[in-house]
């Protein structure tokens, strides 16, 4: 789909920016803290756009936000007066999951006349209902993803049902089934409990469940250097999966608790050195495929959420095409240190790219 807001329009806006006062902007949710923390580490100014009633963390961490803008709802950022105010501050917006969810892809692509760090046309690609979606890019890159089932009756092995939660649209009510009969039983139960709707379930993605060890592989694609960097790994803490599974098996069976996978935190990880070659190859191939299919390609961070099988193969089950939200990496990743001599997270790497682009007068190359 062609965007109504063109690269030329955004370039014209950013060309008018005061390079001494460029400001990193984000909406107050998801990964705003790590974005602003990285910006402050690089001495950049910051603005946090908060929804009234959700501003407390951004007020308490006083170092991070130079300015907090309170709105009745996040989507009010689309109002022309608010956009103009942000342009006056020479604001470059940084996208994360909440940015996409609360503003909406159509609005971001067609109505938000603010420079966004990254490729705004790639945000929609995360959605599995999009025609040229993340599976499409993985296939173009030659990267394995789980087998897809086009209808529930095709399920012939353990499968993951990926469906939106009924009440919290930011969350996904994933669940695992062992067969079509198990799917019917669990689907009916979740609809009756109000966890999902039948409409969302009918649109759900059904994937083969791939056993293995989970790693979220975080990369950064730099238009300034032309390189794809491997910044680090994190894993997710999920309720009620963690730490229910640490109970003795007998107690788990006695409790008969329905397992859910709602992400609530992060934990660091590293990977055996002999697997790093595969990791680098995956990042390079995915970046190349994205550049061919969605020019100008990836700008900044992505995450290939992967399973390493018993055969040491990588299977990518989800892709994040914006700030993935992994603040733990800022203090725990050895891989960023291998590049730069110190640990850092995604937020600081974004800020470094913005500063390099300003110094070389190449801001046009990192925003859309």
PLM features per residue range, with description:
Residues 207, 218, 294-311:
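A short glycine-rich, hydrophobically flanked beta-strand micro-motif that places a catalytic Asp/Glu
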Residues 219-290, 320-351:
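ATP-dependent carboxylate/phosphate-activation module, predominantly the ATP-grasp catalytic core
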Residues 50, 76, 124-215, 220-232, ...:
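Active-site nucleotide/adenylate-binding loops and adjacent lid/helix of ATP-dependent enzymes
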């Amino acid at each position: 789909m062609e965007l109504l807001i063109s690269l030329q329009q955004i370039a014209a806006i950013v060309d008018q920016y005061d390079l001494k006062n460029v400001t990193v902007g984000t909406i107050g949710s998801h990964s705003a803290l790590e974005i602003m923390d990285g910006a402050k580490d690089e001495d950049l100014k910051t603005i946090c756009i908060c929804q009234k009633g959700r501003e407390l963390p951004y007020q308490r961490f006083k170092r991070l936000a130079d300015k907090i803008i309170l709105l009745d709802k996040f989507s009010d950022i689309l109002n022309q007066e608010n956009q103009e105010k942000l342009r006056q501050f020479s604001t470059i917006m940084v996208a994360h999951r909440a940015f996409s969810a609360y503003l909406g892809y159509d609005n971001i692509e067609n109505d938000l006349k603010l420079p966004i760090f990254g490729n705004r046309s790639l945000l929609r690609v995360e959605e599995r209902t999009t025609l040229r979606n993340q599976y499409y890019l993985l296939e173009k890159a030659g990267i394995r993803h789980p087998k897809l089932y086009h209808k529930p009756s095709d399920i012939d092995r353990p499968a993951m049902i990926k469906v939106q939660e009924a009440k919290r649209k930011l969350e996904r009510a994933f669940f695992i089934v062992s067969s079509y009969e198990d799917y019917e039983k669990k689907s009916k139960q979740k609809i009756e409990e109000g966890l999902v709707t039948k409409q969302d379930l009918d649109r759900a993605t059904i994937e083969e469940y791939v056993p293995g060890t989970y790693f979220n592989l975080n990369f950064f694609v730099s238009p300034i250097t032309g390189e794809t960097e491997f910044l680090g790994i994190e894993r997710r803490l999920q309720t009620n999966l963690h730490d229910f599974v640490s109970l003795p098996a007998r107690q788990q069976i006695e409790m008969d608790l329905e397992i859910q996978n709602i992400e609530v935190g992060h934990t660091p990880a590293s990977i055996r050195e002999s697997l790093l070659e595969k990791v680098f190859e995956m990042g390079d191939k995915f970046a190349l495929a994205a550049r061919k299919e969605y020019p100008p390609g990836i700008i900044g961070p992505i995450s290939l959420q992967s399973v390493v099988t018993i055969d040491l193969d990588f299977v990518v089950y989800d892709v994040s095409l914006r700030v993935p939200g992994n603040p733990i990496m800022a203090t725990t990743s050895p891989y960023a240190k291998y590049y730069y001599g110190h640990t850092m997270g995604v937020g600081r790497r974004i800020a470094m790219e913005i500063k390099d682009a300003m110094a070389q007068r190449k801001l046009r190359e990192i925003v859309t």
